[in-house]
Amino acid sequence: MKLFRSTLLILLFVFSATISAQSIIRTTLDPGELPVIPSNWTKKNVVGLDITQIAFINWNAGGTSSISGLFKGEFSRTYIKKNNKWSNELFAKYGLNKQEETELRKTDDEVKFISTYGFRKDSLSNWFYSAKFNFNTQFTNGYNYPNIDKPISRLFAPAYLFLGAGVENSNKEKDRKFYFSPVTLKTTLVLDQDLANQGAFGVRKGEFIPDPVNPDDKIWITPGQKVKTEFGILFEGHMKNEVYKNVFFENRLQLYTDYLHKFGNIDIDYDTRLDLVVNAYVKANIGIRVIYDDDIQSKKDVVDPVTGTESQVDNGPRAQLRQVLGVGLVYAFK
């Protein structure tokens, strides 16, 4: 009897221990019962494609068939922890147009990266002590169509870099932010020597003498400058408002002036866009971009009255304008 009781007690103890162990293991391994730790990172990924197509078949009034496409991408990664904020944004655009009996032509080309680190005194403030880095260039060669023999721009020709420190007011709820830096270094890169020799995009042009053997050729005494550095004041602003249901008005403005060279002459880059959202995947947009840089000389064609040859001469700085109207598909993903 004692042996039976002892055996029964041992079995009950083992059974109880087994049940407890299973409960512990089940509690430990069940992912649904684990606490969710919020991430300090937020991200945004949006890609879009605008397509415009016109076709004419036996159209008596005349016309040229064409098709255009514009790819757009916007990506962002933002890290916020306590009083620290680090935001990174990447914007990319590339557009092509094909008309009947003409070559494929580029209509838009841009890649821009913006990185901003900010520190605020308390987590309730919208004011940050900030450091900002901007970089923008293009993907492929640009031409003055129909002339495609010599590119007028290339990858890293030009490229613009901004690096500075200042203050930023960032309001996520109202989707707006303003940045002011009294100390910003601006670097213009023209890493194509032919374009640098011409003084393209504000770099110092090269000096040459005509080739005595072939007067049409040039002997470069001093090559053009590939890098231009400026030091000045930078202001950037961004606002996005819903002006009507599913109608959004977005503005981006950048102003820069150099302390050392023509202080007060302001470089302007203003981009405004009106988005009309049909649904989560279809959107129409109207955009205008205006650029003015006092160091960039526009060109105009002139004809020599004696020889009849055509050439281009500097025509002073001019405002640059681009207007876009498109309807296309958008897709956002995590």
Placement of each model-derived feature along the sequence:
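Transmembrane beta-strand segments of Gram-negative outer membrane beta-barrel proteins
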Residues: I37-Q53, N84-W86
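Residues that define the transmembrane beta-barrel architecture of outer-membrane proteins
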Residues: S65-F71, T107-V111, A157-L163, V227-I233, ...
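Residue-level signature of outer-membrane beta-barrel architecture
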Residues: F75-Y79, F119-K121, N169-N171, G237, ...
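Repeated loop/turn-to-beta-strand initiation elements of outer-membrane beta-barrel proteins
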Residues: N84-W86, S123-F128, K174-K177, N246-F249, ...
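Outer-membrane beta-barrel "beta-signal"
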Residues: L274, A319-K334
